[in-house]
A protein has these predicted regions:
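Active-site neighborhoods and metal-handling regions in enzymes and metal-associated proteins
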Residues: 1-233
Length: 233
């Protein structure tokens, strides 16, 4: 459970997380040592104590326990138990819903962030070209997926890529009727529709790209659908 605390009274954010991950904050952030807090493993999966009791102690030690505190209530890893615990431990604080607050701030990218996203765009373009060149009737879907992964991670001669937040989504045939399936070990068939939803990633900055392919002869229904989409665009 790794999170950040941003306070108007502090020059830097505060990182907190599991003890074994504390050094990751030292290696990958600019934070000073006094802004990195790592809790011990007895907080993990313990019904008698919770990591946010530790977080409450951090806020108390920094004089933030009586402030207005906005929490990201729709974050994937900020559970109802986290919210209940922090409210119980900080009775003098005022809690507000900070839904999407950080995302709104991060909409405006720095020049460096834009550079990273452009590099991710080159990586995903290469990965998509690999998929286009390799997908064919009789080719196994899993072999294409392996080549796509290689392109995503190997990146370019100048810089490499990283794992993406989600696996390549590349269903074929009837499986395209639901968008979030990926490959199987079956081979591509004549007439298959193939959805490709890929991503390039450079230093955790993503650039997604989606394309649709038809193998062999498309049915009239698919042709009509394509014409309608083109007209709409």
């Amino acid at each position: 459970n790794e999170k950040g605390i941003v306070a108007l009274d502090l020059d830097q954010p505060i990182w907190f997380g599991r003890g074994q991950d504390g050094n990751a904050a030292r290696l990958t952030t600019y934070l000073d040592e006094n802004n990195i807090y790592a809790y011990t493993d007895d907080y993990v999966n313990n019904p008698l104590k919770h990591p946010y009791e530790y977080v409450a102690d951090i806020l108390k030690s920094r004089g933030l326990d009586k402030k207005v505190i906005a929490t990201e209530t729709d974050a994937y890893y900020f559970s109802a138990k986290c919210q209940q615990t922090i409210e119980r431990c900080l009775p003098d604080a005022t809690f507000k819903d900070g839904y999407n607050l950080v995302n709104w701030v991060k909409i405006i990218k720095s020049p460096t962030e834009i550079e990273f996203i452009r590099k991710a765009a080159v990586i995903v373009q290469n990965a998509m070209n690999v998929a286009y060149d390799m997908i064919d009737i009789g080719v196994r879907q899993c072999d294409v997926a392996a080549a796509v992964y290689h392109a995503q991670i190997s990146g370019t001669k100048e810089y490499g890529g990283e794992y993406s937040a989600i696996a390549p989504l590349m269903p074929a045939g009837i499986r395209t009727s639901t968008p979030h399936l990926s490959w199987t070990d079956e081979t591509y068939q004549d007439g298959d529709t193939v959805i490709l939803e890929l991503s390039g990633n450079y230093r955790h900055y993503h650039c997604p790209l989606a394309r649709t392919m038809i193998l062999g002869n498309a049915s009239q229904k698919v042709r009509d659908l394509g014409a309608t989409v083109s007209e709409g665009l």
